[in-house]
């Protein structure tokens, strides 16, 4: 038990002070021995840290006695050496303030020293791993020491000597081993990877490694070799990475003429993707490089880096600003121009081997062509995506939207230009896959357009290509100077591009389905209904569309709508109603057609998991007018439901048609509940009043209401369609009249019906025969086909019908009141 807790204990400050004097004497011995060990350590950096260990205050491990035992030594009575250092009269020495633990003084290492120790530890493991031919471990050691070196550069520590020694050791290990000696595939793969990385690192640190080879002993004695930029000669650059000075793109831009071209380009490449990177300075510096580029290779390399940097600058924006977008487009034009001029010497392809050193031109292949790794069409796709995003964010009612839409032609020109380039330079085994991407983009810009608009785009595109440096050789359809882009040419373009995608069914089902839908949409819009229907039915798209991605589902829904409109234009009312019915009854028609606003799509983005919001929206100029869809659907319902309702109410047994929100039957039932009916104002009102006129047998008034609907002008050849629709209204009004008023006639004159509905006698006879056969009406034509003779049956009058309905309602309400 401690003496402090004893009742008889008396604190003696004198004895305590004597004990502390003994302790402090032993501590001074430990401190002095520890300081001698510290002085013997080597330093491997330019900036040597002053030891701060003398300022460390460690509590004594010996137990203090007295009521102030819990205080720090300097606050106790008598202090750590028998006196309080805060008293003015006290002669306090700072050496007495440090105290050690029983096992000796604890040495605190700086971050530099810890990083150095880790590098030394890895350096010591290289020999043992090499002796065992463990290249997987060697590769891990190389990756670890590279991470440490990167950390040293980030902290502005310079280049450690131990890193240079490690590089030289790795190089010796690689040189001493032959790949033929390695039988294991995994080890051989690790060896090849290590060899390539070491080769690159030695190249980057050539000056430092060379100095080490010449005088290894100096690296053990001298603290540091200066760090260089990408391990090249620092004297060639106006700045250095060594010490505490960082890379500055502004400095590069201001001293561009003093720098080596590829050194500067490497600095720009290394700065991409890093935090706090100034994209404006990157673009400015790269543009300066483009101005001083002399060889085609330098221009190509600069373009391949400048265009992605422009896209990087707008990655956090809704879309790329117009100025930068046009600059990117001009850069792409410039890149293609250089490649077209030097097509026999330089080619940019996605399938070229990787070049670790950009300053070294790739070796020429067997055809004498130097292949440069890059993806031209990826940049074209990105440019197209930024164009689409800008259209989605611009107000569709503004003049800015129309101005922006004019840039679509330049995108289309680039796509065709890329197609011609890829046809010439891409190897046969990769051509189909790459051209499929090109054709997808090309079709996206023309499949929904009318023949007139496609002709304009094709004519302008091929005219610009003929004026440029591009080759006009193509194995696909192209527009010659003597040809005209008429409807036949447009159909040939769409068919050839779509068929190319359709043929890839075994390799790429996605391309097959998109090609089928592109072709179906175009034919339904510009040609005929029957061929489009045949293409759609012959494919299996409808079976699997529910499991497809959002973009394909939207395209499929658009095709279905266009098929319905094509059937309406062909006068196939029943088929049009069947095709449109599945989509028009959907309350989210705007969303499933991709015609919602971008803001609304962002709010509902959780509906389609994993789909980019831009895929759920189409630019405004690609929309199918929803009012037109509703008008066509309700007009079809008008022509089908009104005669059907008249037949049902007249007592004829007919199959009951399902009632939907937009069906004319539901609209009529809703209108009957209204107390006051004003003149028609909306689209729905005009259809309603046309239906009521048909029920009365007034076909002229019904046609007049339909003609007042303005959306008919959106259909091609709208006058012909209205005339065709008028004839349909006449016939269906005749049917409605016969069903409604047959109970009042024993026979009706055919000639009278012909005059009443302004139809030929042959058509009236055909309608009468159709009613008798299809609806099983108890009637017949006389021998001379002059009258329709009705047989009296168990038909009820209108008054009886109302009475029966009233009885049913009374019975229903009586039972309800009893409950």
UniProtKB/Swiss-Prot annotation:
Subcellular location: Cytoplasm
Domain PCI: 620-795
MF term (GO), any: RNA binding
Keywords attached to this entry: Cytoplasm, Initiation factor, Protein biosynthesis
Ranges of compositional bias, category Acidic residues: 17-41, 47-59
Pfam families: eIF-3c_N (PF05470), PCI (PF01399)
GO CC terms of this entry: eukaryotic 43S preinitiation complex; eukaryotic 48S preinitiation complex; eukaryotic translation initiation factor 3 complex; proteasome regulatory particle, lid subcomplex
Stretches the record annotates as Disordered: 1-106
Stored InterPro entries: EIF3C, EIF3C_N_dom, PCI_dom, WH-like_DNA-bd_sf, WH_DNA-bd_sf
Any GO BP annotation: formation of cytoplasmic translation initiation complex
Assembly behavior: Component of the eukaryotic translation initiation factor 3 (eIF-3) complex.
Family membership noted in the UniProt record: Belongs to the eIF-3 subunit C family.
General function of this protein: Component of the eukaryotic translation initiation factor 3 (eIF-3) complex, which is involved in protein synthesis of a specialized repertoire of mRNAs and, together with other initiation factors, stimulates binding of mRNA and methionyl-tRNAi to the 40S ribosome. The eIF-3 complex specifically targets and initiates translation of a subset of mRNAs involved in cell proliferation.
HAMAP family per UniProt: eIF3c
Protein name per the record: Eukaryotic translation initiation factor 3 subunit C
Native species: Kluyveromyces lactis (strain ATCC 8585 / CBS 2359 / DSM 70799 / NBRC 1267 / NRRL Y-1140 / WM37)
């Amino acid at each position: 038990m401690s003496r402090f807790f004893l009742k008889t204990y008396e604190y003696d400050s004198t004895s305590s002070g004597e004990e502390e004097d003994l302790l402090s004497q032993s501590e001074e011995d430990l401190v002095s021995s520890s300081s001698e060990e510290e002085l013997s350590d080597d330093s491997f950096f330019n900036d040597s840290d002053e030891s701060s260990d003398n300022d460390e205050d460690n509590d004594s491990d010996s137990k203090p006695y007295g009521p102030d035992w819990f205080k720090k030594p300097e606050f106790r009575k008598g202090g750590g050496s028998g006196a309080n250092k805060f008293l003015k009269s006290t002669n306090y020495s700072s050496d007495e303030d440090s105290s050690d633990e029983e096992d000796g003084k604890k040495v605190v290492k700086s971050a530099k020293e810890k990083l150095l120790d880790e590098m030394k530890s890895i350096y010591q493991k290289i020999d043992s791993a090499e002796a065992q031919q463990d290249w997987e471990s060697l590769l891990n050691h190389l990756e670890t020491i590279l991470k440490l070196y990167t950390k040293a550069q980030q902290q502005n520590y310079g280049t450690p000597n131990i890193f240079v020694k490690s590089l030289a050791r790795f190089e010796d290990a690689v040189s001493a081993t032959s790949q033929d000696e390695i039988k294991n595939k995994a080890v051989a793969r690790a060896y090849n990877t290590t060899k390539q990385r070491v080769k690159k690192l030695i190249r980057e640190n050539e000056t430092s490694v060379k100095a080490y080879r010449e005088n290894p002993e100096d690296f053990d004695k001298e603290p540091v070799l200066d760090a260089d930029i990408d391990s090249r000669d620092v004297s060639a650059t106006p700045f250095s990475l060594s010490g505490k000075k960082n890379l500055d793109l502004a400095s590069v831009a201001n001293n561009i003429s003093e720098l080596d071209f590829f050194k500067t380009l490497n600095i720009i490449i290394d700065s991409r993707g890093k935090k706090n990177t100034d994209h404006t300075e990157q673009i400015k510096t790269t543009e300066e490089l483009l101005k001083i580029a002399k060889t085609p290779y330098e221009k190509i390399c600069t373009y391949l880096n400048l265009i992605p940097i422009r896209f990087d600058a707008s990655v956090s924006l809704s879309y790329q600003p117009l100025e930068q977008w046009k600059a990117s487009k001009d850069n792409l034009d410039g890149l293609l121009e250089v490649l077209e001029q030097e097509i026999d010497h330089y080619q940019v392809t996605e399938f070229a081997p990787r070049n670790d050193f950009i300053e070294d031109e790739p070796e020429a292949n067997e055809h004498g062509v130097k292949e440069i790794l890059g993806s031209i069409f990826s940049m074209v796709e990105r440019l197209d995506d930024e164009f689409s995003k800008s259209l989605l964010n611009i107000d569709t009612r503004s003049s800015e939207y129309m101005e922006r839409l004019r840039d679509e032609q330049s995108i289309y020109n680039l796509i065709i230009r890329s197609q011609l380039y890829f046809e010439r330079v891409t190897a046969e085994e990769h051509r189909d896959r790459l051209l499929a991407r090109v054709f997808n983009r090309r079709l996206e810009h023309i499949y929904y357009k009318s023949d007139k608009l496609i002709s304009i785009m094709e004519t302008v595109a091929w005219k610009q290509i003929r004026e440029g440096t591009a080759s006009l050789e193509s194995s696909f359809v192209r527009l010659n100077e003597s040809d005209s882009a008429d409807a036949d040419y447009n159909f040939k373009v769409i068919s050839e591009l779509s068929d190319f995608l359709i043929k890839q069914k075994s390799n790429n089902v996605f391309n097959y389905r998109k090609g089928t839908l592109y072709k179906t949409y175009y034919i339904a819009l510009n040609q005929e209904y029957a061929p489009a229907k045949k293409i759609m039915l012959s494919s299996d798209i409808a079976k699997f569309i529910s499991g497809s991605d959002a973009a394909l589902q939207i395209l499929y829904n658009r095709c279905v709508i266009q098929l319905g409109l094509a059937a309406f234009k062909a006068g196939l009312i029943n088929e049009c109603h069947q095709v449109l019915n599945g989509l028009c009854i959907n309350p989210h028609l705007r969303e499933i057609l991709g015609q919602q606003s971008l803001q609304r799509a962002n709010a509902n983005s959780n509906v389609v998991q994993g789909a980019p919001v831009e895929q759920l929206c189409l630019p405004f100029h690609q929309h199918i007018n929803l009012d037109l869809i509703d008008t066509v659907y309700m007009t079809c319902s008008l022509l089908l439901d009104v005669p059907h309702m008249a037949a049902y109410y007249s007592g004829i047994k007919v199959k009951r048609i399902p009632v939907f929100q937009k069906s004319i039957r539901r609209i009529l039932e809703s209108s009957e509940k209204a107390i006051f009916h004003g003149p028609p104002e909306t689209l729905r009102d005009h259809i309603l009043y046309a239906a009521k006129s048909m029920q009365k047998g007034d076909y002229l008034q019904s046609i007049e209401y339909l003609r007042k609907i303005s959306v008919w002008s959106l259909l091609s050849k709208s006058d012909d369609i209205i005339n065709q629709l008028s004839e349909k209204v006449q016939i269906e009004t005749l049917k409605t009249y016969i069903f409604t008023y047959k109970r009042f006639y024993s026979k009706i004159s055919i000639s009278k019906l012909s005059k009443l509905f302004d139809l030929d006698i042959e058509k009236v006879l055909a309608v009468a025969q159709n009613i008798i056969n299809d609806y099983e009406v108890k009637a017949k034509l006389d021998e001379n086909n002059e009258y329709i003779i009705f047989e009296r049956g168990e038909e009820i009058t209108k008054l009886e019908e109302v009475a029966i309905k009233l009885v049913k309602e009374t019975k229903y309400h009586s039972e309800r009141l009893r409950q």
